[in-house]
């Protein structure tokens, strides 16, 4: 089928003024219109969560992060982890914090004694109301006064120009879902037919530096269920090797070159096929957190 034929088959046009987006399925049109109004009708029902998403595939990915089995519990703070490696790293952070806090207390007490002695020698004597904080700035002392106080592993968001940094136990996947995936995208120039098939938000811009640049897209439209079936027909026995080539496994994309990163590949699946394979999300989790691969998949 030609590109013209595919364009004519898109009968569902966005009704927002100035928007020319057209889709071949009413569900994609509704998801696109949600981006105009910032409506997020897909709610997480996990107790205490309440996160909301524009598209159902985003909710499915998010709910997977809740369903992770974390059998390794810290006896000091009750945080839970997937692997022994994660737990050991976390326990080491407790030990480092304890040692550093002791050094801070000893050093801080010595500095305060010197400050008090100096003030006692001045006219007016020592003011007992002086904050027992940093002698340099007069503020209450906090961990933030010392860079590197918490030297646990940190994770930088992989999206360009995003300064988000999460601690080891935070969920970077959810940050990416809420702030990047399906919200900002650079559409390759020179092919206006692509712009008709991609759900975008009012904030999307071809000059947005937080976008993933120059992704490759398929212009064929298939339903979410068809896309899932065509990909999950090959259930990977080893997700690490299955996705490590950063290639789309969809039958329509076999000729595409590998994507620059696993995050570009996730973005491609989301925008082109309207779903994200669960095993790809698990692989990206491995890519971010670097635990033992089989520890993560043994459930």
Curated annotation (Swiss-Prot):
* Motif Nuclear localization signal: chain residues: 96-107
Pfam families the record matches: zf-C2H2, zf-C2H2_4
Query: Is the Transcription regulation keyword given for this protein?
Result: yes
Q: Where is this region: Disordered?
A: 191-242
InterPro entries for this protein: Zinc_finger_trans_reg, Znf_C2H2_sf, Znf_C2H2_type
One example GO MF annotation: zinc ion binding
Q: Which stretches does UniProt call biased (Low complexity)?
A: 200-232
Annotated phenotype, changing residue 120 to D: In strain: MMW1-15h2, MMW1-2h2, Sgu52E and Sgu52F
Q: Where are the zinc fingers (C2H2-type)?
A: 12-36, 42-66, 72-94, 155-179, 246-271
Q: Which GO terms describe its biological process?
A: cyanamide metabolic process; positive regulation of transcription by RNA polymerase II; regulation of transcription by RNA polymerase II
- Supply one GO CC term from the record: nucleus
Q: Which UniProt keywords apply?
A: DNA-binding, Metal-binding, Nucleus, Repeat, Transcription, Transcription regulation, Zinc, Zinc-finger
Cell location: Nucleus
Describe the task this protein carries out: May function as a transcription factor.
Additional notes on this entry: Present with 2120 molecules/cell in log phase SD medium.
User: What is the name listed in the Swiss-Prot or TrEMBL entry for this protein?
Assistant: Zinc finger protein FZF1
Q: Which organism is it from?
A: Saccharomyces cerevisiae (strain ATCC 204508 / S288c) (Baker's yeast)
Query: Mind giving the lineage of the organism this protein is from?
Result: Eukaryota, Fungi, Dikarya, Ascomycota, Saccharomycotina
């Amino acid at each position: 089928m030609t590109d013209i034929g595919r364009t004519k088959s898109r009968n569902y046009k966005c009704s927002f003024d100035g928007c020319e987006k057209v889709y071949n399925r009413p569900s994609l049109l509704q998801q696109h219109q949600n981006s105009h109004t910032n409506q997020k009708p897909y709610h997480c029902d996990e107790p205490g969560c309440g996160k909301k998403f524009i598209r159902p595939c985003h909710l499915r990915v998010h709910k997977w992060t809740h369903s992770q089995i974390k059998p390794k519990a810290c006896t000091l703070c009750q945080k839970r982890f997937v692997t022994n490696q994660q737990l050991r790293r976390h326990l080491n952070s407790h030990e480092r914090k304890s040692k550093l806090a002791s050094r801070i207390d000893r050093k801080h007490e010595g500095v305060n004694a010197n400050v008090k002695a100096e003030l006692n020698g001045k006219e007016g004597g020592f003011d007992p109301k002086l904050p027992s904080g940093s002698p340099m700035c007069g503020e209450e002392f906090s961990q933030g006064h010392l860079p590197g106080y918490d030297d646990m592993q940190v994770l930088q968001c992989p999206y360009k120009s995003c300064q988000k940094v999460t601690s080891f136990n935070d969920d970077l996947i959810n940050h990416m879902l809420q702030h990047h995936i399906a919200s900002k995208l650079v559409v390759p120039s020179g092919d206006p037919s692509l712009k008709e098939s991609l759900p975008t938000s009012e904030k999307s811009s071809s000059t947005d530096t937080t976008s993933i640049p120059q992704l490759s897209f398929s212009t064929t439209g298939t339903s979410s269920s068809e896309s899932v079936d065509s990909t999950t027909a090959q259930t990977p026995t080893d997700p690490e090797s299955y996705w490590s080539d950063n290639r789309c496994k969809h039958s329509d994309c076999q000729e595409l070159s590998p994507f620059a990163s696993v995050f570009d590949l996730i973005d491609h699946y989301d925008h082109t096929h309207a779903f994200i394979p669960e095993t790809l999300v698990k692989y990206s989790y491995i890519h971010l957190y670097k635990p033992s691969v089989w520890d993560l998949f043994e459930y």
